[in-house]
Design a protein with these regions (language model features):
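Short, mixed-charge low-complexity intrinsically disordered segments
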Residues: 33-105
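Surface-exposed loop/edge segments in extracytoplasmic proteins
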Residues: 12-18, 50-53
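A short, charged, amphipathic alpha-helix used as a generic interaction element across diverse proteins
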Residues: 8-9, 19-42
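Short aromatic-glycine-(Arg/Gly/Cys) micro-motifs in beta-strand/loop hairpins
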Residues: 1-15, 45
Length: 105
């Protein structure tokens, strides 16, 4: 089961990569931080429906008001759920770790 999704921006569009474990998701998130053009957003946990921000965004999130935190967290979760539903509903190809590693090789 691909419980986690690493969410990132590429060419002004949201994308995600499925991961089976949180450790794997954090490794992909860290790898994305070093890739040109990638803007990692965070990790979505489909089982708990929680979102974990990448470090810079976590700092910004922590400084926001409670109302703002609720709004941006809801938006991030909605984006993650929409990406997952899109992949489940259509015959499109789901992103994988191999795809991310091959993009810049």
């Amino acid at each position: 089961m691909n419980r986690f999704s690493v969410i990132y921006l590429l060419n002004r569009q949201y994308h995600h990569i499925y991961c089976a474990t949180q450790t794997e998701a954090y490794a992909i998130l860290e790898h994305g931080l070093t890739q040109p053009g990638y803007k990692p957003i965070g990790i979505y946990d489909a089982k708990t429906e929680l979102f974990y921000w990448e470090p810079t965004r976590q700092h910004q999130y922590n400084r926001a008001s409670i109302e703002r935190q609720g709004k941006i967290a809801s938006q991030a979760i909605q984006v993650a759920q929409n990406l997952r539903h899109r992949d489940e509903a259509g015959p499109g190809q789901a992103n994988s770790i191999a795809q991310l590693l091959q993009i810049n090789n």
